[in-house]
Amino acid sequence: MAGDTHCPAEPLAREGTLWEALRALLPHSKEDLKLDLGEKVERSVVTLLQRATELFYEGRRDECLQSSEVILDYSWEKLNTGTWQDVDKDWRRVYAIGCLLKALCLCQAPEDANTVAAALRVCDMGLLMGAAILGDILLKVAAILQTHLPGKRPARGSLPEQPCTKKARADHGLIPDVKLEKTVPRLHRPSLQHFREQFLVPGRPVILKGVADHWPCMQKWSLEYIQEIAGCRTVPVEVGSRYTDEEWSQTLMTVNEFISKYIVNEPRDVGYLAQHQLFDQIPELKQDISIPDYCSLGDGEEEEITINAWFGPQGTISPLHQDPQQNFLVQVMGRKYIRLYSPQESGALYPHDTHLLHNTSQVDVENPDLEKFPKFAKAPFLSCILSPGEILFIPVKYWHYVRALDLSFSVSFWWS
């Protein structure tokens, strides 16, 4: 049984009045709250937003809450029509405004921590599905809400040892003997110039040691710590062995629910918090990591670096694929087995024909169908077992396959 994975119904943690802290983030009057929406948003929706804002500033909480629900329902339909890339950003702003108003209404007279947790979930939905509004106000609201929640309790059940000692799934349970394979070289804190000349420019993978092992996350992060900092936050979770499988899907749940369902208890399915910009959503976690100095060798600005979290149980798999940017993969918890193939070997890796999966191989790396994919057997590769504190440099377009050998948390930095 999963146990209590939600934030408990306890008295609020008092650090000043919650409503006072939230109200201080808002413009003084409704006239100062600029919406600035484009022509694609119907006039009737703009009018509804203006009316909801007026209701909020007039203190008519119940009516404002009702209006915000209408805004959210209508804009949700717009967000889920067609492909995500084609959704107009103004509709994402409308959704974010609806989330802001609803969260604020919920917090005007909170009764217990469950009410604040519900408001926090609304904020997270705005952060995940909406667009930035009013100087990233949803981030600020979420941060305040977290300070007014009581300490998070870990999900009930036996927390696995770290690294995870549960039996691995039968299909991918073996730890490969990388001594039999050509391994990725390891270097201890190479100079920027040496890294640039020997690895960045020629596009050669390398594992960097002594660069990240002093980061706070290496000592602080555990299941309990992650639950304490992020337990009540809503995140996207991939369900299924790998994203190329037909039964693969995505869902939204809190971090507590994810840990309880896919890590603490014996799961029927594989769950993976993968490729999520968790550190933008929860800046407190971002304080525990650093951007590697080697990223300064790129052409882009620091704010253009994409930082993703990869958190899941033993057995999670990222199929063989390539990315359009340079990648530093930092291992924080657990170990991962990784295979790397040069872009020059693309013809032997049989990429999918579809536009959506053109950067992903059809080959199951550790159980290949060599009758269907005969060239794969002769494709040379590098491999490694990446351990906590190590950083793997994956050059742009380099094919890579990743399998978690333990309960694992990785951080990737995509840069140009």
From Swiss-Prot:
GO MF term set: aminopeptidase activity; chromatin binding; endopeptidase activity; histone H3K36 demethylase activity; metal ion binding; p53 binding; peptidyl-arginine 3-dioxygenase activity
GO BP term, example: G2/M transition of mitotic cell cycle
Gene3D superfamilies: Cupin (2.60.120.650)
Keywords: Aminopeptidase, Biological rhythms, Cell cycle, Chromatin regulator, Chromosome, Dioxygenase, Hydrolase, Iron, Metal-binding, Nucleus, Oxidoreductase, Protease, Transcription, Transcription regulation
Reaction(s) catalysed by this chain's protein: L-arginyl-[protein] + 2-oxoglutarate + O2 = (3R)-3-hydroxy-L-arginyl-[protein] + succinate + CO2
Lineage summary: Eukaryota, Metazoa, Chordata, Craniata, Vertebrata
Gene: KDM8
UniProt KW Iron keyword: yes
Stretches assigned to the JmjC domain: 271-416
Stated role: Bifunctional enzyme that acts both as an endopeptidase and 2-oxoglutarate-dependent monooxygenase. Endopeptidase that cleaves histones N-terminal tails at the carboxyl side of methylated arginine or lysine residues, to generate 'tailless nucleosomes', which may trigger transcription elongation. Preferentially recognizes and cleaves monomethylated and dimethylated arginine residues of histones H2, H3 and H4. After initial cleavage, continues to digest histones tails via its aminopeptidase activity.
Residues annotated to bind a protein: E238, Q275, S318
Effect of W310A: Loss of L-arginyl 3-hydroxylase activity toward RPS6
Swiss-Prot/TrEMBL induction comment: Up-regulated upon starvation, DNA replication stress, UV treatment and by camptothecin and etoposide treatment.
Binding-site list for 2-oxoglutarate: Y272, S318, H321, N327, K336, H400, W414
Locations listed in the record: Nucleus; Chromosome
InterPro entries: ARM_KDM8_N (IPR056520), Cupin_8 (IPR041667), JmjC_dom (IPR003347)
Phenotypic consequence of H321A: Loss of H3K36me2 demethylase activity
Protein name as annotated: Bifunctional peptidase and arginyl-hydroxylase JMJD5
Originating organism: Homo sapiens
Tissue: Weakly expressed in most cells. Highly expressed in breast cancer cells. Expressed in embryonic stem cells.
